[in-house]
Design a protein with these regions (language model features):
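Short helix-capping/turn signature of helix-turn-helix
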Residues: 38-39, 115, 177, 213, ...
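ATP-binding/phosphotransfer module of carbohydrate and carboxylate kinases, centering on a glycine-rich
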Residues: 1-153, 193, 261, 269, ...
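Short, acidic, Ser/Thr-enriched surface-loop or helix-capping motifs
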Residues: 113, 166, 237-238
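Short glycine-aspartate micro-motif
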Residues: 97-101, 153-157, 223-227, 233-235
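Glycine-rich phosphate-binding loop and adjoining helix at the ATP-binding site
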Residues: 118-144, 148-222, 358-369
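Glycine/GP-enriched mid-protein hinge/lid loop-to-helix segment characteristic of carbohydrate kinases
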Residues: 121-123, 131-135, 181, 185-203, ...
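Short, active-site-adjacent cap segments at secondary-structure transitions
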Residues: 163-166, 205-208, 233-234, 243, ...
Length: 415
């Protein structure tokens, strides 16, 4: 039975770099929107200065954004050198995006505008063995209901677990849910709502949310988002671009082996990281070692993890041992991310991150032990501080950016 627990390839430019090359028009268009997200009101001249472009280039970009209804003029403002200029602002509330997160046990639907403001958020739980068509029908109904309530929605983004094969529109493997690999999400949703519909891998969605909306030191060159929840995954943004690979399935950190003689994973590999530090694994360890922390009967993995974290904070030694084991494996994952991608920052998110105050010291200890000083001293490792689930946030951000890359589709929606 479904239960309601609700409540009411993306590019971001580095802070001062743009390009006058026509091949980068879409990137520059996204960058202008990003500047207006940060500044609220800004002149063409100030945008040109911040991006390092000519004012003529910015004028052309802004003209397209105004035609799309994304940007409007707000009258005279004080610009550089105290000169008066025409101000620009985002028409945020007139351009809303639905973000959808599909996960094991639940899906979530949220409404955002292009400035990142959230208007609504609802979560629907379902048993992991629930029939796929029942879950898909519930997702579609919730999106239709949301469209009825919010009339300014211009696009929909869906984040799904990976490895997601973007050209085929399906997930290659959904651990714990093997029957879902036959579901073609693209075919199921693309023509359902009469809105542009985009699908993104959940790790990539989290990376996008952190890149666009995370409170991190700027500029960043390479960001790694490390998703540790019902599954384990990651998303990498380097130089402003998502690292996707030929099929869109790059950076599957959860299926990197940490024990070549370990248990066989559903993906076919042995000793996958996901088998050692995901929420289901933590729940399993808790049942074996600290059952007194758990409720009798069925309990969601994330709720069980929270119970273990609370017990550990209270000094329960067995709970602390469970947390240390999970934290060490997250640390091994960070070691792999650092050696593979040399990021400025690793952001750990999803349900396990709720124990960040306990986990982070353990993770950093492992990294310090296993990474050379020249690398580990240059990477920042932190827990996501976003108030909205990064995966849900990123699903909406991905849809926003895709529309900015294709103005003709955007204008067709607005007509």
């Amino acid at each position: 039975m479904l239960q309601n627990r609700g409540r009411g390839r993306l590019i971001k430019m580095r802070d001062t770099i743009g390009s006058n090359n026509s091949d980068l028009t879409e990137m520059n268009r996204s960058a202008v929107v990003k500047i207006l997200q940060q500044r609220e009101v800004c002149s063409r001249a100030d945008i040109a200065k911040q991006m390092g472009l000519t004012q003529a280039s910015i004028t052309k970009i802004v003209a397209v954004l105004m035609e799309m209804g994304i940007v409007s003029e707000v009258g005279s403002i004080k610009g550089s050198g105290n000169r008066r200029s025409i101000g620009l602002k985002l028409n945020a509330d007139r351009n809303q995006i639905i973000g959808v997160k599909f996960a094991r046990h639940m899906f979530a639907v949220g409404v955002f505008d292009i400035s990142g403001k959230i208007y609504s958020h609802i979560e629907i739980e379902y048993p992991i063995e629930e029939d796929q068509q029942v879950v898909l029908a519930s997702m579609k109904k919730q999106i239709h209901d949301t469209l009825q309530q919010y009339k300014n929605v211009v696009a929909i983004g869906l984040a799904v677990p990976g490895p997601y094969l973007q050209d085929e529109g399906r997930i290659a493997v959904v651990t714990q849910m093997p029957s879902w690999h036959n579901i073609n999400f693209l075919n199921e949703f693309k023509d359902e709502f009469n809105k542009p519909f985009f699908i993104v891998h959940d790790g990539n969605a989290g990376a996008l949310a952190e890149w666009w909306f995370g409170e991190h030191e700027k500029p960043l060159h390479t960001l790694a988002y490390f998703l540790v929840g019902e599954g384990v995954g990651s998303g990498i943004i380097e130089g402003g671009n998502l690292l996707l690979g030929v099929q869109g399935a790059a950076s599957e950190i959860g299926h990197i082996s940490v024990d070549v003689k370990g248990p066989r994973c559903e993906c076919g590999n042995y000793g996958c990281l996901e088998l050692y530090c995901s929420a289901p694994v933590m729940y399993k360890l808790a049942k074996q070692r600290v059952p007194e922390c758990l409720l009798e009967g069925y309990q969601q993995n994330s709720d069980a993890c929270n119970a273990v974290f609370e017990a550990a904070r209270g000094g329960n030694k067995k709970a602390l041992e469970v947390v240390r084991e999970i934290g060490e494996y997250i640390g091994y994952g960070c070691v792999t991310l650092i050696n593979a991608y040399n990021p400025d920052i690793i952001v750990i998110g999803d349900s396990i991150s709720r124990g960040g105050d306990l986990l982070l010291p353990i993770v950093k200890e492992v990294v310090k032990q296993r990474i050379i000083d020249e690398l580990h001293t240059k990477v920042q490792i932190k827990i996501s501080s976003l108030k909205v689930d990064p995966t849900l946030y990123g699903a909406a951000a991905a849809a926003t950016d895709k529309l900015l890359q294709m103005p003709s589709a955007f204008l067709a929606v607005k007509e």
